[in-house]
């Protein structure tokens, strides 16, 4: 067999040179394959990392699907703030007198929620999150647990009995309506014939109506809501006002429906969400004292002035021997990456934030202003002797519930909403406002002199 020139050339070379020459040839043959292999391995690593990151994202932001309750329970035990078998004194027991209801944490409770939205006809479609597409139910399973005492389990029949022949009135903005609808559902859960709970003027619940009065027929009691987002009167400006003044807030005059609240047995105020630039000056709403429009008055000063008017009205117009007065503090919003107008979102939030408070600085400013007004009113006007005003200080507890908002699911059958127009201000029902009403229930029972040998899970006249 004849040899080719390459073989003859190899035989004429020393063995070491032959090895080197053949190695070089081998390298040339495999170089493209090694490049392809390297590219393949790098690509595989990238794909794996994407799957890993996506898994972490899903684990943090999506609803968790557990095979059974025990698996879910074990997972929840790992969460910060989750506590099991924490035996505490009952709030309504004698030894629970010094307990602060608002110093506590959110704990998982499989017995919640207290009602289902599909069973309650009183809920605005904007709060029916689960019925209109929200995929998770975790937000309905959290109960507020004070650190040093247990709240009484909400008993709708007991509260209705205590409300017999009485009026319970909510006055405030749409977050107040949120809480009012929550209490209607909580109480109606004890009524088998829902036709015996009705609006006395046959008005359907809508955010455009000024007030609603719902009667529980068998108990001759009413649970009412009056829309008054500023609590003081918003009206036409005085003659001769600048053209840009469309309306004014009369800081020395209560809302026109105030006469309807005066004789309530329980009166629950709230305000705050409308005391901002968007809801006032941007829309041509300025502040008025007497007949003078204060064009340069800051919103914070106007808010303080209005709250003093509210405190003065409570002192002078409310019968302290009959009426319990509560003031619920500001419930924070949880927009991320913007606000209502600029594309803020909250739809990825499915668990409470057990860490640091998310309360923004402007919210604390509202709280500080209210605290200052209450403190000065108590000090200078002897209001403590005439009105037993209690503060439902829900700001810190609500700040942790970034998971509780309607987000995309507030448009009913027309939803979900556009991604850039989410609702991270109001609350899904059932949900966070139920806990505010459980606090109201506990303080109401305390006032009524009710005591129980054992509670489910504190009374404070001011901020702690």
From Swiss-Prot:
Molecular function GO labels: O-acetyltransferase activity
Motif (GDS motif): 172-174
Cross-referenced Pfam families: PC-Esterase, PMR5N
Motif DCXHWCLPGXXDXWN motif: positions: 423-437
Location of this chain's protein in the cell: Membrane
Lineage: Eukaryota, Viridiplantae, Streptophyta, Embryophyta, Tracheophyta
InterPro entries xrefs: TBL, TBL_C, TBL_N
Protein's name in the database: Protein trichome birefringence-like 11
Record-annotated membrane-spanning stretches: 33-53
Keywords noted in UniProt: Membrane, Signal-anchor, Transmembrane, Transmembrane helix
Described function: May act as a bridging protein that binds pectin and other cell wall polysaccharides. Probably involved in maintaining esterification of pectins. May be involved in the specific O-acetylation of cell wall polymers.
Membrane topology, from the record: Single-pass type II membrane protein
Species annotation: Arabidopsis thaliana (Mouse-ear cress)
GO terms for cellular component: membrane
């Amino acid at each position: 067999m004849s040899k080719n020139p390459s073989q003859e050339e190899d035989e004429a070379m020393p063995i070491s040179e032959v090895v080197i020459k053949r190695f070089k040839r081998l390298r040339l043959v495999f170089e493209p394959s090694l490049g392809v292999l390297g590219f393949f391995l790098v690509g595989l690593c990238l794909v794996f990392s994407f799957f890993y990151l996506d898994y972490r994202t899903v684990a943090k932001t999506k609803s968790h699907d557990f095979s059974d309750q025990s698996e879910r329970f074990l997972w929840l035990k790992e969460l910060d703030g989750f506590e099991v078998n924490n035996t505490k004194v009952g709030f309504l027991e004698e030894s629970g007198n010094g307990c602060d209801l608002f110093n506590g944490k959110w704990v998982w409770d499989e017995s919640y929620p207290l009602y289902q939205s599909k069973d309650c006809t009183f809920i605005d479609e904007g709060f029916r999150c689960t019925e209109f597409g929200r995929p998770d139910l975790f937000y309905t399973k959290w109960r507020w647990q004070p650190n040093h005492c247990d709240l009484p389990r909400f008993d709708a029949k007991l509260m209705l009995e205590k409300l017999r022949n009485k009026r319970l009135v909510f006055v405030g903005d749409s977050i107040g309506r949120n809480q009012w609808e929550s209490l209607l559902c909580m109480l109606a859960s004890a009524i088998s014939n829902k036709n015996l709970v009705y609006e006395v003027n046959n008005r359907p619940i809508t955010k455009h109506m000024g007030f609603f009065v719902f009667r529980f027929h068998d108990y001759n009691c009413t649970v009412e809501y009056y829309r008054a987002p500023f609590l003081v009167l918003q009206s036409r400006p005085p003659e001769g006002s600048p053209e840009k003044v469309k309306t004014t807030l009369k800081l020395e005059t209560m809302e026109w429906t105030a006469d309807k609240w005066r004789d309530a047995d329980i009166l629950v105020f709230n305000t705050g969400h409308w005391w901002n630039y968007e809801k006032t000056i941007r829309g041509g709403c300025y502040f008025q004292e007497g007949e003078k429009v204060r064009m340069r008055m800051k919103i914070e000063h106007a808010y303080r002035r209005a709250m003093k008017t509210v405190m003065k009205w409570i002192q002078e117009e409310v019968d302290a021997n009959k009426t319990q007065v509560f003031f619920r503090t500001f419930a924070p919003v949880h927009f991320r990456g913007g606000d209502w107008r600029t594309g803020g979102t909250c739809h990825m939030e499915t668990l409470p934030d057990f860490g640091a408070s998310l309360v923004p600085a402007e919210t604390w400013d509202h709280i500080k202003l209210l605290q200052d007004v209450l403190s000065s009113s108590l000090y200078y006007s002897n209001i403590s002797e005439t009105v037993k005003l209690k503060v439902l200080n829900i700001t810190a507890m609500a700040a942790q519930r970034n998971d509780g908002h309607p987000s995309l699911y507030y448009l009913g059958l027309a939803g979900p909403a556009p991604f850039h127009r989410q609702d991270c201000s109001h609350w899904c029902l059932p949900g966070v406002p139920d806990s505010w009403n459980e606090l109201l229930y506990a303080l109401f029972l305390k006032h009524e002199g009710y005591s129980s040998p054992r509670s489910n899970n504190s009374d404070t006249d001011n901020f702690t």
